A protein has these predicted regions:
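Cytosolic, long alpha-helical scaffolding segments
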Residues: 1-193
Length: 193
């Protein structure tokens, strides 16, 4: 079920990338991302419900909760970005948004692949590689944020600066949540592999 949730996150990111690459019908595209976020919320509820009914779990309950929560946070950030793009009446995507989204996609892909391997712990080495890649992408996200902010703060329109800063912060936060998932997967590996 967690694997389905991570796939849903990837689909949400794909929808955001589509929105940024083809920046028209933004309200319709925002709604598609909202649907992915709602689907994610349903999955969280379902997973936690099943967890409450299950006496013995293959991994610690706390780790399951952390995975589920961090994956949900990624979708929450995506929804916030798409909402702000529409509500703030952003005419075209800010310069670094697509690059943030692509970095987030790479990180989420690696998260998804690591989670898929959790099912049977067969390839701990490959899981570690996926987790290490997520950390690399998180560092790329941090560097991109610094670069984007430095350029942004050279602007003159304070309102525009605030709007775009919030968008960049949400994207970087989503990448950070991918790193949180990778950290939990790493913890699980230490405990069980």
């Amino acid at each position: 079920m967690i694997e389905k949730q991570s796939k849903n996150v990837l689909e949400g990111i794909d929808a955001l990338i589509d929105m940024l690459e083809h920046y028209e019908d933004t309200d319709k595209k925002r709604q598609k991302i909202k649907e992915k976020e709602n689907e994610g919320d349903r999955m969280v509820h379902e997973i936690l419900s099943e967890l409450n009914k299950t006496f013995i779990t293959p991994i610690d309950r706390e780790d399951i909760c952390k995975l589920v929560s961090s994956l949900d946070d990624i979708l929450d950030n995506l929804e916030a970005v798409s909402e702000r793009l529409v509500l703030y009446k952003i005419k075209k995507p800010p310069k670094y948004m697509l690059e943030f989204a692509q970095t987030l996609h790479k990180a989420s892909y690696n998260v998804h692949e690591a989670i898929a391997l959790l099912r049977n712990f067969k390839d701990a080495t490959q899981m570690r590689i996926f987790c290490k890649e997520v950390h690399t992408q998180e560092n790329e996200g941090d560097a991109l944020l610094r670069k984007a902010m430095a350029e942004l703060f050279n602007g003159k329109d304070a309102v525009e600066i605030i709007k775009i800063k919030e968008l960049y912060d949400d994207m970087e936060s989503a990448i950070d949540r991918c790193e949180d998932v990778a950290d939990v997967v790493g913890d699980i590996l230490v405990k069980y592999a």
